[in-house]
Amino acid sequence: MLKVGDYVSRNSYNNDIIFVIKRIENGVCYLKGALERLVADAPLDDLKKENEVTETFEEKRPTLEEREDYFYLPGKILHIDADLDYLNKCLNYYKSVKIWAAGKCINEQEVPKQITELIKEYNPNIVVITGHDAFNKNKNTYKNSHYFIEAIKEARKYEKSHEKLIIIAGACQSDYEELIKAGANFASSPKRINIHALDPAIIASSISMSDATKEINLKEILENTKYGSEGMGGIITKGTMYMGYPR
């Protein structure tokens, strides 16, 4: 018998993604991706129990080629996430690469109302705006892309420069083109696919630890994410890390 907290996959989708059961009501299980930023529901009889989550994607962690006589100031990150579990995963990732990051768990629809004050409070170099999203092919609509777009626009009212404030926005299947048009430096999802829970954090960390005086290697940074340029895309910009002397 399946229960809340079990790992499962969906038979109707060839068991392609591992989920965690968050709740069960009237024979329907409400699911969240164990690794992908995805929420779904499925009848009990469509689910196969999985014993464990096997992560085949090994995230690449940015590293510094430090010189003993210099000190380094990576860019600061404000990570806004509608999902607390994924937020904590991302904060742990930032901690593992020794980057300063503040995290806020806020529902997608509330972010446009709060983002300006959060930017004023934390004064970040990089803002991540993420959570959950979905593309309905039949209706040609998105679950939460509108809120991401409005949040980006509000942030750009405060700081228009794409180099003074780096914005990384979107979640699974988000409206990539409109997020970029709204003012994001990076966004999901060019091919309307699901993205890994850590993908926004991987890009944010790479930008944080890239030289502020040089343009980033856009393709290389995108290749560090699980699905590459199919899941995330962006514009060429400069990094946010400064180097100083003496140490």
Show the residue positions of the predicted features.
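Internal alpha/beta domain cores that form substrate/cofactor-binding pockets in large enzymes
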Residues: P74-Y176, K181, F186-P200, S208-D211, ...
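Intrinsically disordered, low-complexity, charged/polar segments
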Residues: L35-L78
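Short, solvent-exposed secondary-structure boundary/capping segments
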Residues: G27-L35
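Short beta-strand-centered aromatic/proline hotspots
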Residues: N15-N26
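N-terminal accessory regions of nucleic-acid-interacting proteins
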Residues: G5-V8, V28, T56-F57
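Short coil-to-beta transition motif at edge beta-strands of beta-rich domains
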Residues: M1-Y13
